[in-house]
């Protein structure tokens, strides 16, 4: 793993410059950066989103989808903020940003699987947080961001990455070595570096870098632990990042949850799968 010690990234790994990773949509990044500012005004968020008409249109479309299921459809960004709240808007804009970042690559089945896994992880993280004590908006946002390194590798080298995913089988962790062999970096390392390069909130760095590391038995329940379980639940619920992904049995995943979350969460993988699929489908057809 990379060490966040202030070294020049090219000095850490000379292949970083070679990757030539494309920038993330500016508006989505700015919304996420503003989210950490307690003094931000709602009109600032509205003006920022509205400054990019295509982005604003996509935000409104998804805001009115089954993903958020508002009681009253929003016809403007101001209304969307009023209906959904500023906190939900952060995760929504990041979701729109990820979809825009992948662009036409989403037409490829392997890329669509990566996208669906990412969104499934975010939705599961949101649900787990809703029955526990962690912040739902932060959990959803962390879920969307957890595989940002994988998304970046997929976008910059789509053909090679699809071939890698198609040929690989094993645990989600085992693919990291295959990525390092091909790119010089794995998606956790790339994600950690992008948190810095894109000036994202630094508290997401350990989540992005360590989301494949399961919680130890005596460790407290935390956001990184929630994302780790959510990521594997996404695989089990029918949204694996690659076809040969090793699946953890759902009862085993439930056993990893704290008592409160375990008692209030979906008792069967079938009910979880149906709900997640319905919400993702609503975004894809929006």
Residue ranges and their predicted role:
Residues 1-169, 173-248, 285:
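Conserved alpha-helical "signature site"
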Residues 1-12, 218, 253-286:
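Terminal helices and disordered tails flanking the catalytic cores of nucleotide-processing hydrolases
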